[in-house]
Amino acid sequence: MRGDGDGWAVGPDGGRRWGVHGAAGLLLRAPRSDGNPAVLLQLRAVWSHQGGTWALPGGARDSHESTVDAAVREAHEEAGIDSTSVAVRAERVTSGKLGSWSYTTVVADAPAPLDTTMNGESTELRWVGEDEVESMPLHAGFAEAWSALRTRPVRMLLDTANVLGATGPSGWWRDRPGATGALLADIAAALPRTVELPDGTFGWVSRVEAVLEGRARSAIVVDDRTRVHTADGSGDDELARLAAADTPDTSAVPATATALDPAVTVVVTADRGLRERLPHGTMALSPSAVLGWL
């Protein structure tokens, strides 16, 4: 079905770009059986623009659509992706600029590599490991944008007491072990996932490490997506020690971390004093960002 966005937009330089109202594509990421992320790519039909190259499902945005709606619709039309299996994480303008013609990449996750159904705009659809994408013949626009869209493995450390306190007056202090266990179970259930990092890049979180102190140390945690560190004294001291450790817990990051994609350590805390103690290169993430997953 043709929409009112189908057609060429002509820029001030005379260049033609597809999509009267701009265009959007869906970068859909999902965990493979080994826990590492794969993305859905299409091999563009030979008759299309830059045919024979790999890119994201996407196309022109209609005037009544948001960029998210357009990207999800195009993924359904071109790859048979069910919108109910798509969890949107972020949007990025990866070509052009807002206010004129632009291409927006919608970053999203699926719970697993989904089955696909190809239409005439592709000659193949494939779930490709992130570490394999650069070796493929990519559409020029996607190749230029890929470095800002790919994820880095994340080693995520939770200041659990601080995150629990950020949930508000829920009465968690009456049963701190129970509330801690419930919180960690909810966080684990949201993994693995793409996370937008404070520096504007993206990370892949497959597991978290939670530091427990005081009465919370007796919390029952059974999900293997959560590793527990019990602090004998201050939880902040334990978090600072873990963040500064020369040899991180590599089981908390995918096995494909390379020199190109080194794992980044992220500490989830709003504690200013703890943030100031973190080593150079460690990122701090607000508890509200993680609570937003739930």
Residue ranges and their predicted role:
Residues 165-294:
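Nuclease catalytic cores that cleave nucleic-acid phosphodiester bonds
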